[in-house]
Amino acid sequence: MAGLDNAVMVRDDQGNPFILVRDQEKKRRLHGIDAVKSHILATKTVANIVRTSLGPRGLDKILISPDGEITVTNDGATILDQMEVEHQIAKLLVQLSKSQDDEIGDGTTGVVVLAGALLEQAEALIDKGIHPIRIADGYEKACQVAVKHLDAISDVVDFSPENTTNLFRSAKTSLGSKVVSKAHDHFANIAVDAVLSVADLQRKDVDFELIKVDGKVGGSVDDTKLVKGVVVDKDMSHPQMPHRIENAKIAILTCPFEPPKPKTKHKLDITSVSEFEALQAYEKEKFQEMIKHVKDAGANLVICQWGFDDEANHLLLQNNLPAVRWVGGPEIELIAIATNGRIVPRFEDLSSDKLGSAGIVREVSFGTTRDKILVIEKCANSRAVTVFVRGSNKMIVDEAKRALHDALCVVRNLIRDNRVVYGGGAAEISCSLAVTKEAEKIPGIDQYSMGAFADALDTIPLALAENSGLSSIEALTAVKARHVKENKAYLGIDCLQTGSNDMRKQFVIDPLIGKKQQLLLATQLCRMVLKVNDIIVAGSKDDDYN
């Protein structure tokens, strides 16, 4: 029976047996309101860490891994993912930001800050004696009101392949808080071009598998470019092979350039010079045979997933057949998609109809180093693209990649659903007022919960104002008063201090699906946390029983 390894049978004075379970005194337990408050404290602590990273003036965090690797970022999902979080409920917040990142790609910081604020408000209601489940029910009702209100205040942004201004502005908003903000025009253009290159506008679908984001240290972020094709971090297998091939016919191989070997363990005994020469001749004959297969198919470039030795390399050079070796599986697949080629597992299967085609394949060198990359351009399938990111150090390249990922996701979300709400806390302030208005119509305890939900929504504009160096309470009350007076849902916090609170004029927008997801995910997490009222931590098995 499970669990009896820490139990012992003993007898009392009368000889009656009973079981004594050891290590019970080592178990720790939190119960009831204490447990709920412990969870709320953990979530508030995590939310406060990322709160200062919210908005265009949000600050970055330095994260140092156990092996000394440094990451500088203000991306909420990355900060939480790389933090050493031990508390079980705090781990749920990490998963919350990850699910927002996986589903929407942007708004990871906002969803964590909102969840922390909702639980902070719940703590105040618990102190007043309201049951956690009643609070969770009120939050669910308030969330439905807020989501419905978002639909009502949303605007539609029009775009087409010829007119991408609105997509460009949306991507620019996403990049405003990132390390690449000085080059946000350039990155926004790249994001829009990349997404439109692979998008199916009829089906409103974007295949992110066709967008590869690669990077190399050196140059500045302004040197980042979009390649209509594939960039591979490899070079030609021999320095004397041509560095530029036009009208390339590419054989994409997953079989090694080497003589066949038995699949079982084997040993070859060579006892004389003639036997060794015969083996050499056999190997050479096999190499020649493989090269003939490739040549007969009409290929003028070989891309191989495996390596090949110097002898094979020399024979390829002699036969004027440029080759690239040790190309990874994902790159092989992308090259096959881009060039309309087929991945060939055996030389015997190679034929002209399985070759990929590209206008130009060129080798590019960097600075004074011997670093080289292979660029495959003017491909048969123009839908595959690569963004090649540059930066002065690895940290900037990595953060630029993360920033670009957010911008790509924003553009993709608008292609899926082109309805938007306004940023700068405008949507949250408008929802807060709508929830407060609805709460006044509801009698009973739910009114308190809905009011708390409305107060929690105000945390986003408060944090934006705080991070921008404004007086947070004054900025929020001023904008809220204008919302009530003018009934304009596009008035938000002037984070960049342009002198206008009109987010429509500044074109600070958030995709509607992203904002809805934030509210729904944060509310679901709060319900889960408020329902847990007991924590039992088992004692360590390593301790001896005394």
From Swiss-Prot:
InterPro entries: Chap_CCT_epsi, Chaperone_TCP-1, Chaperonin_TCP-1_CS, Cpn60/GroEL/TCP-1, GroEL-like_apical_dom_sf, GROEL-like_equatorial_sf, TCP-1-like_intermed_sf, TCP-1_chaperonin. Its main location: cytoplasm. GO terms for molecular function: ATP binding; ATP hydrolysis activity; ATP-dependent protein folding chaperone; unfolded protein binding. Keywords: ATP-binding, Chaperone, Cytoplasm, Nucleotide-binding. Belongs to the TCP-1 chaperonin family. The keyword Chloroplast does not apply. It comes from the Eukaryota. GO terms for cellular component: chaperonin-containing T-complex; cytoplasm; cytoskeleton. GO terms for biological process: protein folding. Transmembrane segments: none annotated. Heterooligomeric complex of about 850 to 900 kDa that forms two stacked rings, 12 to 16 nm in diameter. Molecular chaperone; assists the folding of proteins upon ATP hydrolysis. Known to play a role, in vitro, in the folding of actin and tubulin. This is T-complex protein 1 subunit epsilon. It is found in: Cytoplasm. The lineage of its organism: Eukaryota, Fungi, Dikarya, Ascomycota, Taphrinomycotina.
